[in-house]
Amino acid sequence: MHRRSSGSPVEDDAEDPLISRTPSEPSGPNAVEPSERARPQVARTGTSFDLRRDHTGASTPRSRNSSTWRMPSSATTTLLPPDPRSSSAAMPLTSQRLLAEASPDAQSRSRPARLRSPWPCSILTALTSLLASLFLCAILRSFAARQTGGDGCGIPVMSPAFLHMAGFDTEHTRFASKYNLYLYREQGVDPFNHENLGLNGAPVLFLPGNAGSYRQVRSLAAEASRHYFEVVRHDQERLRSGTRSLDFFMIDFNEDMAAFHGQTLLDQAEYVNEAVAYILSLYHDPKRSRRDPELPDPSSVIIIGHSMGGIVARTTLTMSNYQANSVNTIITMSAPHAKPPVSFESDVVHTYKQINDYWREAYSQTWANNNPLWHVTLISIAGGSRDTVVPSDYASISSLVPETHGFTVFTSTIPDVWIGMDHLSITWCDQFRKAIIKSLFEIVDVRRASQTKPRAERMRVFKKWYLTGLEPIAERTLSQKEPNTLLTLEDQSNTILPQGQRLILRELGHRRSPNVHLLPVPPQGVAGKKFTLLTNQRFDKSGEQGTLEVLFCSVFPLQNGKFSTVFTMNMDFSGGNVGSTRLACKNAAEDAIHLPASTHFSKHPYDRAEPFSYLQYDLEDLAEHQFVAVVDKAQSPTKGWLLAEFSDSSDAVIRARLGLGGLLSAGLKMRLPANRPMLTEVKIPALYSSLLDYNLKIVRRNHGNQQELFTPLLRQSIPDPHESKFFVNVKDVNVNLHGVAPFMPPPLREQAAVGGVSFQLWTDPSCDSTVDISLHVDIASSLGELVMRYRTVFAAFPILVVALVLRKQFQVYDQTGYFITFTEGLDSALRSSLPMLLLAMSLLASSLATSSRLPPSDDPFHWPLNSTESPIDFTKNDLLLGSQDAFFWFLVPLFGLICVGVCVILNYIALALLSVLAFFYGIFKSKSGYIKRDDKRLVPGFHSTSVTVTNEASNLPIFSAPTPRKRMINTAILLLLVSTTIPYQFAYLVACIVHLATCVRAQWHAKETKSTTHYNFFNYTHSIFILMLWILPINILVLLVWAHNLVVHWFMPFSSHHNVLSIMPFILLVEAMTTGTMIPRVTTRFKYITSLILFSIAIYAAVYGVSYAYLLHHLANIFAAWLVGVYFFSSGFSVRRLWRVLEGDEGTSNSEPGSMKKKP
């Protein structure tokens, strides 16, 4: 029987294959004993050998075609007397396999086959993978199950009609065949026809996001048309003030993917500027417009951008074809302003940097004339934790725009919306679209060429509609108004409450006639006093006939000399008595703050219930007034109630003096006394990170019999960005926030980074009950926060692991001649380099977070004012995991652990795929006449005495390959296409597919021949394949953009991604491996270059891989270039050798002078 050995060395088989061999004892398949003079002699003999043994156990040469191994002429073979003691130690691996078959004790000395198999893994690797899988499952489960709020969005009603602006053709833009411009008209509401478009108002342009549709605007546009038709056009005062309809235009980007390709982003911005110019020109044509000819022609357009459409909107203002002041208002929804959503493409990262630098530079100018964006307002609206497409942290513009020109707000903050939204529902949610459209109507002023009010007024409108009114920057109108109501009271009236007493009305209309309750305003000079009023009724404006009106009054005539002789309202409660008190009052309805209703039946803040009305003033805001008048105008008893009081900050504000460590260890517990104010504010500065979730419990302990007017209402808020969340009928709350987030650039204002979370709790103080509050870190829920903040970690950290594994594999290979399996390399890395590198990265992360701080400044926006002041480093959080808190140092080893498990999973998935494909490949080979286990072309030769093979001979091809001419032509064509037409990412995909086929063939041949050299080659190709798989996602996104362009018949080549040097090393490396040629060992000092390159890739993947992932391809490309160099220069570079490498037959040469080698 023809016995098979494992083909392993015999001297070292009893030892671990990773143990170093001594230099004096060559081993492995590349052991060399040169004999130059023997090479031509063997080449000329043409002897073939049969490896069958005779009765003595010795192998004898026989001429048999079915089982002969042809001796390549390059094999350096020395015919020596047999010496069993030294032959196995000195000969290379392939020769040792020949001798092993001739030896009776071959099986005992051979390397066990199970150690060569790529499937087994060590206990350490298995336990690490199991632990990583458990962490990964816990994170994904937490992300899927964490509390994100219910749906809650109303369904909009619309009748859309989209009019294609066919006139916007190639005469106006070079993108006319790719993009399109449309005008929205609401059927049955907007008058229009093909001759006259019915343009009558202010132009608004909608920009869809990444792969988004222009039809997403229909809900906003329909609401604008219906609101104007049903409300605005009937309000003559608003019409006289310049309010008109909104003409919604929209751009069809053909579902282009600007998030993945920087040049596409710039192309869209160029098209938008050309579209804006065309839209403005439409209003000059009286045949297309129904505008009043006395009104000025529009010179500016309002832009609404969804997702990447918001970034395109900001980019338009930086383009060379931008017309100055043609855009002055930008509203974005779920737009990633601060950071690109993915960093896989260099142009996207560079374009983002250029755009953000332009905006920062513009707003850093001292004089408005030097700021091209002085008249621009930017409002960024984020959906919150329900948005699983773009991290809502990235919507922050605090690092770009001062609060005088814009702000960031969450949909859960907007009054009467109070709900988080996902990435798509933010475009159609009924409550949200109503707030957006009402705010737009309030900023429109068609009497101005800009079509909008001045910037300061626009900012006041946006703050009024988008902020709760409880923020420090919220503006109050009370001090800006003149008294318009004269309130006359009887002198002997008992309606004035004693100083400091709380006003409680449990029922309105109890007296069945109008009634007045006066609260005296405390004297000025008492610090921290605050007035609060809460009711379930709506406040009446002057002249309205409702149930409740709140006035702030001063004794008439006014003490400061401002005499007001004309009052629009006169409220007389004196009964005609001569001795009466007259008060000049201001109505406070415009300062009313809506809060979600909180009753025993409330479940969500967005429930369809009439909201509470709330007033809040600091005592300083009431300096001109002596009384607060609450006028109960109900004519019959109602269920309305009211609470009003003046409170001290010492009782109403609680600041928690504990750090993050205290929250983790013991949590926070406190009890509010029964005599507390209606509003209690708890500030926790240590609670600022967006990576941690908390569980808040509120327990009421009733001691009285008085029924509650309302159940506890909680507001969770942070100052920047403006994120507020309301919880009604609160008992148990999951607290998550978008505060200090990873990778975010620092804000322009230093104080924006501090402050922490504030909890405002409204409770009924009239029930004589205490309230217990407890706060604890929710570890399980916090795991889910890692998904959105660190998704791109799984594009970087696995490359760290793979690089260290490859480093270990090449170290062992260069030292011993064995190319160990991926799992063996991973096990070795887990015992040495990987823990040390992760430890070093953890220390670096902690050091960077500790040393991170903002430069001090007295400037309100904290911009550098002179050369001695250090500017803000907006990229300082790009390193490692981007954490600004040293507390999260453990995330580095955690993600390293998870990525080890992910790499193991991908390794086995790849092995399974290769095994399946190899099975079908074997079926094909058997049908084509291939004889199993007889393809011994790899073995260079044999003689009955002893055989020694050079390093060159051991690297022979193990399977046939196309002719070198064909491979050169294919490579040249591919590189030519890369330099002209296709992006190099397409060539990379081709290289991955070709290398997959190489791995399939390598695995099949290794299984069939049971040769260690075959297994070496398979392990080598498989590890390179794993590396290429992890690099593939970095390239696939640009490839999707390119393929999408082909689908929409846009055949203009990319202006970037045609550098052949970015792909040539990969192509040459893959071509070299298609010949079945094993990479030569590097035994000189140059072997350290391999380790250095791979270690550099690992360090870069850890430090910069998340923020600049696109460079990982280029680093891997450098590694591929080095491997190609090893192929070419291992035995000296020459044209002849280059030809032999391409041919895949390094062993065929003729070293004799003047000899000729025939081409195949």
Swiss-Prot record:
Cellular component aspect of the GO annotation: endoplasmic reticulum membrane
Keywords carried by this UniProt record: Endoplasmic reticulum, Glycoprotein, Hydrolase, Membrane, Protein transport, Transmembrane, Transmembrane helix, Transport
List of catalytic residues: 307
Gene3D superfamilies registered for this protein in UniProt: alpha/beta hydrolase
EC nos: 3.1.-.-
Molecular function in Gene Ontology: phosphatidylinositol deacylase activity
GO biological process, any: GPI anchor metabolic process
Taxonomic superkingdom: Eukaryota
Bias type Polar residues, positions: 57-92
Membrane topology per record: Multi-pass membrane protein
Disulphide bridges: none
InterPro entries: AB_hydrolase_fold (IPR029058), PGAP1-ab_dom-like (IPR012908), PGAP1/BST1 (IPR039529), PGAP1_TMD (IPR056824)
Ranges annotated as spanning the membrane: 120-140, 786-806, 832-852, 886-906, 973-993, 1023-1043, 1060-1080, 1092-1112, 1115-1135
Region (Disordered): 1-92
Positions glycosylated per UniProt: 65, 866, 1019
Localization of this protein: Endoplasmic reticulum membrane
Top EC class, one word: hydrolase
Protein family (similarity comment): Belongs to the GPI inositol-deacylase family.
Function recorded in the entry: Involved in inositol deacylation of GPI-anchored proteins which plays important roles in the quality control and ER-associated degradation of GPI-anchored proteins.
UniProt protein name: GPI inositol-deacylase
Species in which this protein is naturally found: Aspergillus terreus (strain NIH 2624 / FGSC A1156)
Gene: bst1
